[in-house]
């Protein structure tokens, strides 16, 4: 982006820039900062000293390529080498060696890391900035209670509160509080120093009685009193060093370490001049905070808004990786100390190489990327998803909030989010408002503040230069910021005399001369997902939120298509996602193929490999298609190959299809969608999906498992696709139940376990019974497809710990079908309810049948009118062969600008194509269309158009499930839950009431016994189903009732149940 003093317009920053900058900051500064903190380590006799030389650390280039790391399930990392020295103090000798400390996972060109073959991304966290915050709350009597909350760098809190008698307390937990005098004395101040350093000493003296004086008579007394209140379990503690250490560890270290940012905030808020390197809370801070609190009580000073972004900080990738590096060095320090002591004890001569091991660093990073809540598996459904995932901001995670405890106020939009955090793009459900998305131009500045760019209005200086400023949330409050964006920076354009502006979180209307800054871009306050919605200003924010989330779920289609109506950001999104192949040098194409492009430039030939049918972790297909012919001269930065869901270097997530808005026989009731068979037969919404199935071979106690094609337990039909090694052949078509990898596991069978006739037959005929069981990899239900890749990965080392892995990749071609979910870009989503023959679909006046029929009742109540504008403009663009790229909020140029644009384009289309039905003045945008079944026109004119419709990842093939019988839970003996476990459907309390209401007693009994947890009855059902006959009625209670009885018995409640016979109603007592 342009810096200060540059002319012209700003450019859109790289969407992955935040991730790259964070990682570079960690490598350049974070590593050095943590290595400098590594202490000199001495042995107990202080004869040997070990130290690291920070000036010379090296990161080695990775030995493997990114693609190989993914396929072989390895980590794409760099080895870290640091020089270390061992000094013998007696002889003053020093031994210096370069040591391998461990592996640090590197960031690749997508802004992600590859750990154990999986793409992972670290998302940024928003935390409360350390410092002090004053707020007031009403107590149960309606009286204002003022509190000052000190937040430490670790997230620990210490609250100062003032009561009705003007006494000041320090609250260390919800139940415990101590006098501020005791706390100050425990921190090392005496009474005289306290009274000298406060503005209101008489208030402090007013609550000082004899008991208090005794408590603060000496530092030891104060510490004892503090310990008794805060950490003591019972008894009378005695002052000692261990007591001080425990208090230091439990309280002061967690709640009193402010860090550099906290010290800066503290000094600024309390008008102190304590040096920046003094990062701990001092008695002086506590007393100044108490003074401010007393001032608040008497109406002086201002309260703080905890939710303002100036009181938040961003914990970026750099901070998280640096914290983990520091943790690894602490572990390394403990290892080195232990090794030195062991070597001295056993009279061995240590060397730096022997003292240091790479395990602490490598395992710390592996566990961080694998287990930390902010390290997530990269969502790669489509190119947009990849970029958006790295730009998320989360309030959740260590030191943050939880979905259960976060209040509405925290989740809400705040005026300081303007241009920094998108007001639309957030997750739905329990985390709404807690996971946000960065605005397009926002960046992370010094100290973790979010900065947004503005243009400085420099008409007063009469210069033609345009200065761009990046302002943090604390600075932009003091400027008048014009809300109008600057697209054309021509100084001669006469601005309006009165403009809307923002000042100190208020929106005003002021004269143009008073404006200091102006926004730089119409999309400045939106995230990437929201910026891809055309006519977003005509939509309700809830629907825009759904749309920005659903675009991330769009499946890349086999034949992608550019949108007719877009916003202009599609090219940038596709470029930054890294799915397209781009020329790094200019030159001439000398060879092109499906797997590589060879480029000749500056006398060198450069081979550019293309991605071929690569699986993403959402099982979508990533594939690159060459876009340049042989012999063509190209320039640097030109697109050589399109990736998944891109066309000509632009993002293309869906298709432009002909849509009509009308109810059709109830088939589009409640957001259902009716589609034409053309979408199926012409592969318009066909997508490819790649599934990965893997199996490992282990060495068991009976011997190693074998991969073989000779499986005596299975019929030959299931093994038809196996080669001589027992692995499925490339290119073969496999159905559910087929064996992909044949595997036998050895097992020992005792002689006594065979039936006597078995033993006799084996003795007579000499038959060898198989001593192994089959543990083959079989294709699960719904997995049919073509085998496109097989990989046999053999890891180095012993096979016990590193088993061989065989991965089979199967490609599925999925057409659109009933039950699939489709959506537009305005939150208009629906499930396909019926696929009609094209002759039955409603058709236009030129005879074209429509492709989809949406329900018009889904528009007015949801207030997403943008879809109607897009629909009509798409029709005009299709007829005129034009593509439109429209920035949002065009009503600022003139009233009804969007409607005028759409109508003028429709009018032009009707003139050029000589089709008057395209624009009919009586009902503009609508047209009379005909019922395909009868040929009669519908009663009213209908809106028709060409919107951009996406097919989403929620597909019926992944969700449909049925079960006759299957696995049962061990304790309750009821069917398991969920599709993955072949589970059954639960008939719960309310379902039982519904069946009772209809009086279907036999169905209800089946549901609660045979089909559920009556063990004997369900076995008899299977038997009678095979043999024939009537199913006997169950005579005893089901297993869940027995379980209830047992659980009550564990509570010492004896419960017996009785069965009353139908004939004579005598009570037959049965033992439960």
UniProtKB/Swiss-Prot annotation:
- Enumerate the HAMAP family for this protein: RNApol_bact_RpoB (MF_01321)
| EC identifiers of the protein | 2.7.7.6
* Chief localisation class: plastid
Which CDD domains does this chain map to?
RNA_pol_B_RPB2 (cd00653)
Keyword terms? Chloroplast, DNA-directed RNA polymerase, Nucleotidyltransferase, Plastid, Transcription, Transferase
Q: What PANTHER family does its record include?
A: DNA-DIRECTED RNA POLYMERASE I SUBUNIT 2
The gene it comes from is: rpoB
Q: What does this protein do?
A: DNA-dependent RNA polymerase catalyzes the transcription of DNA into RNA using the four ribonucleoside triphosphates as substrates.
Intrachain S-S bonds = none
Q: SUPFAM superfamilies in the record, alphabetically?
A: beta and beta-prime subunits of DNA dependent RNA-polymerase
Q: What is the protein named?
A: DNA-directed RNA polymerase subunit beta
Q: Where in the cell is it found?
A: Plastid, Chloroplast
Listed GO MF terms: DNA binding; DNA-directed RNA polymerase activity; ribonucleoside binding
Q: Which Pfam families match?
A: RNA_pol_Rpb2_2 (PF04561), RNA_pol_Rpb2_3 (PF04565), RNA_pol_Rpb2_6 (PF00562), RNA_pol_Rpb2_7 (PF04560)
Q: How does it assemble?
A: In plastids the minimal PEP RNA polymerase catalytic core is composed of four subunits: alpha, beta, beta', and beta''. When a (nuclear-encoded) sigma factor is associated with the core the holoenzyme is formed, which can initiate transcription.
Which InterPro entries does the entry link to? DNA-dir_RNA_pol_bsu_ext_1_sf, DNA-dir_RNA_pol_su2, DNA-dir_RNAP_su2_dom, DNA-dir_RNAP_su2_hyb_sf, RNA_pol_bsu_bac, RNA_pol_bsu_CS, RNA_pol_Rpb2_2, RNA_pol_Rpb2_2_sf
Supply the source organism for this entry: Eucalyptus globulus subsp. globulus (Tasmanian blue gum)
What is one GO cellular-component annotation here? chloroplast
The family classification in the record reads:
Belongs to the RNA polymerase beta chain family.
């Amino acid at each position: 982006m342009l810096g200060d003093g540059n002319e012209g317009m700003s450019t859109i920053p790289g969407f992955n820039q935040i991730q790259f900058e964070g990682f570079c900051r960690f490598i350049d500064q974070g590593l050095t900062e943590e290595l400098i903190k590594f202490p000199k380590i001495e042995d107990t006799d202080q004869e040997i000293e070990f130290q690291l030389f920070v000036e010379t650390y090296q990161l080695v280039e990775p030995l493997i390529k990114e693609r190989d790391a993914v396929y072989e399930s390895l980590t794409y990392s760099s080895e870290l080498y640091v020089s270390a020295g061992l000094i013998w103090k007696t002889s003053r000798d020093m031994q210096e060696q370069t040591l391998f400390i461990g592996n640090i996972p590197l960031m690749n060109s997508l802004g992600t890391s590859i750990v154990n073959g999986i793409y992972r991304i670290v998302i940024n966290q928003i935390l409360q900035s350390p410092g002090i915050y004053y707020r007031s709350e009403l107590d149960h009597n309606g009286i204002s209670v003022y509190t000052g909350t000190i937040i430490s760098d670790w997230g620990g809190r210490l609250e100062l509160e003032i009561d009705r008698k003007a006494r000041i307390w320090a609250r260390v937990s919800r139940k415990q509080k101590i006098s501020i005098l005791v706390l100050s004395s425990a921190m090392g101040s005496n009474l005289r120093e306290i009274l000298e350093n406060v503005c209101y000493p008489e208030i402090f003296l007013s609550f000082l009685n004899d008991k208090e004086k005794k408590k603060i008579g000496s530092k030891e007394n104060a510490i004892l009193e503090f310990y008794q209140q805060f950490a003591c379990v019972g008894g009378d503690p005695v002052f000692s060093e261990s007591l001080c250490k425990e208090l230091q560890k439990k309280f002061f270290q967690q709640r009193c370490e402010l860090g550099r940012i906290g010290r800066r905030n503290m000094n600024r808020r309390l008008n102190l001049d304590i040096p920046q390197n003094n990062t701990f809370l001092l008695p002086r801070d506590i007393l100044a905070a108490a003074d401010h609190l007393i001032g608040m009580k008497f109406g002086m000073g201002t309260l703080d808004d905890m939710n303002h972004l100036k009181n938040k900080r961003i914990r970026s990738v750099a901070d998280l990786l640096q914290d983990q590096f520091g943790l690894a060095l602490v572990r390394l320090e403990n290892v080195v100390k232990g090794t030195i002591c062991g070597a001295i004890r056993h009279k061995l001569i240590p060397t730096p190489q022997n003292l240091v091991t790479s395990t602490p660093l490598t395992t710390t990073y592996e566990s961080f990327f694998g287990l930390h809540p902010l390290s997530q598996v990269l969502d790669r459904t489509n190119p947009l998803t990849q970029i958006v995932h790295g730009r998320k901001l989360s309030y959740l995670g260590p030191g943050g909030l939880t979905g259960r405890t976060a209040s509405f106020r925290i989740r809400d939009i705040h005026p300081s989010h303007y241009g920094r955090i998108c007001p639309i793009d957030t997750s739905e459900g329990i985390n709404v408002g807690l996971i946000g998305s960065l605005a397009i131009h926002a960046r992370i500045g010094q100290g973790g503040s979010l900065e947004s760019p503005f243009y400085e209005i420099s008409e007063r200086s009469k210069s033609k230069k345009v200065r761009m400023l990046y302002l943090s949330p604390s600075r932009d409050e003091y400027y008048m910021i014009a809300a109008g964006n600057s697209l054309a920076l021509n100084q001669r354009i006469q601005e309006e005399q009165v403009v809307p502006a923002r000042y100190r979180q208020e929106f005003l209307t002021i004269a143009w001369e008073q404006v200091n800054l102006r926004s730089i871009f119409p999309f400045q306050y939106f995230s990437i997902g929201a910026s891809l919605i055309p006519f977003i200003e005509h939509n309700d924010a809830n629907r825009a939120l759904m749309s920005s989330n659903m675009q991330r779920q769009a499946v890349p289609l086999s034949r992608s298509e550019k949108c007719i109506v877009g916003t202009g950001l599609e090219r940038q999104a596709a470029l930054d996602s890294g799915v397209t192949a781009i020329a790094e040098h200019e030159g001439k194409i000398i060879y092109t193929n499906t797997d590589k492009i060879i480029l000749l430039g500056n006398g060198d030939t450069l081979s550019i490999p293309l991605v071929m049918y690569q699986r993403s972790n959402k099982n979508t297909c990533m594939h690159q298609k060459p876009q340049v012919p042989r012999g063509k001269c190209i320039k640097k930065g030109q697109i050589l190959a399109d990736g998944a869901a891109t066309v000509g270097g632009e993002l293309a997530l869906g298709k432009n299809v002909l849509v009509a808005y009308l109810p059709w026989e109830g088939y589009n009731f409640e957001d259902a969608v009716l589609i034409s068979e053309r979408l199926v037969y012409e592969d318009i919404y066909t997508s490819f999906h790649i599934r990965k199935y893997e199996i490992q071979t282990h060495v068991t106690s009976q011997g190693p498992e074998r991969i073989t094609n000779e499986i005596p337990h299975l019929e030959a039909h299931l093994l038809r696709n196996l080669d001589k090694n027992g692995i499925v052949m490339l290119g073969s078509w496999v159905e559910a139940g087929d064996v992909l990898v044949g595997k036998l596991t050895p097992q020992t069978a005792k002689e006594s376990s065979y039936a006597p006739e078995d033993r006799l037959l084996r003795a007579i005929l000499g038959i060898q019974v198989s001593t192994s069981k089959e543990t083959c990899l079989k294709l699960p239900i719904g997995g049919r497809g073509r085998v496109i890749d097989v990989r046999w990965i053999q890891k180095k080392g012993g096979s016990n710990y590193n088993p061989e892995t065989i991965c089979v990749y199967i490609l599925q071609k999925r057409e659109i079908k009933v039950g699939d979910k489709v959506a537009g870009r305005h939150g208009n989503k629906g499930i396909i309810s019926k696929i009609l023959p094209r002759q039955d679909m409603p058709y236009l006046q030129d005879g074209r049948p429509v492709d989809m029929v949406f329900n018009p009742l889904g528009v007015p109540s949801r207030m997403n009118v943008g879809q109607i504008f897009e629909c009509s403009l798409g029709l005009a663009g299709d007829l005129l062969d034009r593509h439109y790229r429209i920035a949002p909020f065009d009503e600022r140029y003139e009233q009804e600008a969007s409607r005028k644009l759409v109508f003028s384009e429709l009018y032009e289309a009707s003139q050029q194509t000589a089709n008057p039905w395209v624009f009919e003045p009586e009902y503009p945008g609508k047209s009379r269309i005909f019922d395909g079944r009868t040929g009669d026109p519908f009663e009213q004119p209908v809106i028709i158009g060409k919107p951009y419709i996406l097919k989403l990842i929620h597909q019926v093939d992944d969700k449909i499930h049925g079960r006759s019988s299957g696995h049962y839970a061990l304790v309750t003996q009821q069917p398991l839950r969920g599709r993955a476990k072949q589970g059954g459907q639960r008939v719960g309390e309310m379902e039982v009431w519904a069946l009772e209401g209809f009086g279907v007693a036999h169905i209800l009994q089946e549901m609660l016994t045979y089909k559920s947890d009556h063990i004997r009855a369900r076995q008899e059902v299977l038997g009678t189903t095979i043999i024939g006959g009537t199913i006997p009625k169950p005579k005893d209670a089901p297993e869940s009732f027995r379980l209830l009885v047992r659980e009550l018995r564990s509570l010492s409640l004896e419960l017996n149940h009785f069965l009353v016979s139908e004939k004579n109603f005598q009570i037959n007592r049965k033992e439960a």
